[in-house]
């Protein structure tokens, strides 16, 4: 019988495979959510480089946020990663939600990144 971690890993790998197949070489906006913080990176898999990154632990956001674990923090991180990606010359990405459902903090981050100038 599979554990919860095994099932989560299988979901993540299945989604990553689909993104690689349909992504067409576009950078991916990868999201990691922990119990206390949220992290986002724009990754160029072809070159193997991180083009832009932001998290609720960034000094620019830490003073503004009450906690890094709510939707307000996700919105702030989404806007910041979009701003940094556009500054790096990236506007078209593929959204990699990992094994997480598109709901709550993940959805808030995605919508804020769209408002910030990223298209996916």
From Swiss-Prot:
Presence of the UniProt keyword Cell division in the record: no
GO MF entries: 5S rRNA binding; structural constituent of ribosome
Disulfide bonds: none
One Gene Ontology cellular component annotation held by this UniProt entry: cytosolic large ribosomal subunit
InterPro entries per record: Ribosomal_uL18_bac-type, Ribosomal_uL18_bac/euk
Complexes and interactors: Part of the 50S ribosomal subunit; part of the 5S rRNA/L5/L18/L25 subcomplex. Contacts the 5S and 23S rRNAs.
Its biological purpose: This is one of the proteins that bind and probably mediate the attachment of the 5S RNA into the large ribosomal subunit, where it forms part of the central protuberance.
Name of this protein: Large ribosomal subunit protein uL18
Species whose genome carries this gene: Gluconacetobacter diazotrophicus (strain ATCC 49037 / DSM 5601 / CCUG 37298 / CIP 103539 / LMG 7603 / PAl5)
């Amino acid at each position: 019988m599979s554990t919860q971690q095994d099932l989560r890993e299988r979901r993540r790998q299945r989604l990553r495979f689909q993104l690689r197949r349909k992504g067409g070489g576009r950078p991916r906006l990868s999201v990691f959510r922990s119990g206390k913080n949220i992290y986002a990176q724009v990754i160029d898999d072809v070159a193997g480089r991180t083009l832009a990154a932001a998290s609720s632990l960034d000094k620019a956001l830490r003073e503004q946020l009450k906690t890094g674990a709510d939707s307000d923090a996700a919105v702030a991180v989404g806007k910041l990663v979009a701003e940094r990606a556009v500054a790096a010359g990236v506007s078209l990405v593929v959204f990699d939600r990992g094994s997480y459902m598109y709901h709550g903090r993940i959805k808030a981050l995605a919508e804020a990144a769209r408002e910030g100038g990223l298209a996916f």
